[in-house]
Each structure stands twice: as C-alpha cells, then as structure tokens.
C-alpha cells in the first residue's frame, strides 16, 4: 500500500512540475510526507526532474520564458537544460 501511495504522489508531482510549477513549490508538497526513505527518494527525484527541464527541447520559447521568470534575462535551450544570458 505504501508503494502505491508513493507512486501516486510521485506521478502527481511530476504532473505538477510539467505544468510549470517550480521545484520549491513541489518540495513543499514533499515536506507533507512523513520523514522516511520514501520522502528522501521523492525529494531527490523532484530535484533531478527540476534540473533537467524536459520542456526545453519540446516547446519553443520555453527557456526564454523560464529565464525571464527567474532572472529577467533571455534564455536558450542547450541540450535538456536552459542557459540564461549572462551580464
């Protein structure tokens, strides 16, 4: 039962992340899970998923929107990661 609950939570979090929520929002949801191995695994998975930015190659303008949102700079896709312009 615990595995099914963890899988359901994981899939829900992946869905939320793909909708444009940032890692900090999803980590707040992870904090609601009791402190155990499942929680630490979910935290690591959410962190890795947030770093890869799967929308980068799939959606035109994704990185520009992402970089404007977090740094107020232009951005471009580089592999599976967004690169924001430097000063």
Swiss-Prot record:
It is found in: Secreted. It comes from Tityus trivittatus. The keyword Signal applies. This is Potassium channel toxin Ttr-beta-KTx. Disulfide bonds join 56-77, 63-82, 67-84. Pfam families: Scorpion_toxin_alpha-beta (PF14866). Residues 1-19 form the signal peptide. One of its GO terms (molecular function) is toxin activity. Belongs to the long chain scorpion toxin family. Class 1 subfamily. GO terms for cellular component: extracellular region. Expressed by the venom gland. Its main location: secreted. Residues 53-87 form the BetaSPN-type CS-alpha/beta domain. Inhibits voltage-gated potassium channel. Keywords: Disulfide bond, Ion channel impairing toxin, Neurotoxin, Potassium channel impairing toxin, Secreted, Signal, Toxin.
